[in-house]
């Protein structure tokens, strides 16, 4: 959704073709987001699709499969693996995306500084981790460098009760996609 829109915009600006695999339930529910991507010239595909083995396997197992982020990632990675002219961009789930996600926290810090404020608590969603790191890391940097304004700072990660990743389950490595393509 948001990453697809960002990449679609960048593709338009630089004259690059973009294909977005969008989770089917989001594809159906977020018509405006999808139309924004297509307006910027992207091909938007509902995942699971018939275009990849990962998509076909998911549809064979459940013809009404609504998709998942992991499955959409699998389809995009598979597409990139099979086409030497294709590059894959990842907007979440992996550690290296934390850097560009910090734009959120940096922007927040700047806006708060304009009104001479600093938060006591920073709260962020945590699933794949990039949204939380995006909002929290710029503030945690202040805490690590013993900035007086950050003395009482608390950063709180909030997870969904339906699929907690911090408080329940097994602490182990998991792939960022459904097919195990990602490291």
Located regions from the model:
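Glycine-rich, acidic and aromatic/proline-enriched surface loops and short helix-turn segments
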Residues: 78
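Glycine-rich phosphate/pyrophosphate-binding loop at beta-loop-alpha junctions
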Residues: 6-8, 14, 30-36, 40, ...
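N-terminal cofactor/phosphate-binding cores enriched in small/glycine residues
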Residues: 1-4
């Amino acid at each position: 959704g948001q990453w697809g829109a960002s990449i679609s915009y960048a593709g338009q600006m630089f004259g690059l073709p973009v294909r977005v695999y969008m989770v089917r339930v989001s594809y159906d529910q977020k018509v405006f987001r999808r139309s924004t991507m297509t307006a910027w010239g992207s091909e938007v595909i509902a995942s699971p699709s018939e275009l990849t083995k990962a998509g076909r396997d998911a549809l064979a197992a459940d013809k009404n499969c609504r998709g998942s982020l992991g499955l959409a990632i699998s389809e995009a990675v598979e597409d990139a693996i099979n086409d030497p002219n294709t590059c894959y961009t990842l907007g979440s789930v992996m550690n290296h995306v934390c850097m560009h996600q910090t734009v959120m926290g940096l922007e927040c810090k700047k806006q708060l500084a304009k009104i001479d404020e600093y938060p006591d608590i920073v709260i962020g969603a945590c699933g794949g981790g990039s949204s939380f790191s995006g909002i929290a890391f710029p503030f945690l940097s202040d805490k690590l460098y013993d900035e007086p304004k950050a003395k009482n700072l608390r950063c709180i990660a909030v997870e969904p009760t339906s699929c907690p990743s911090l408080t329940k389950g097994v602490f182990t490595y998991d792939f960022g996609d459904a097919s195990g393509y990602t490291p």
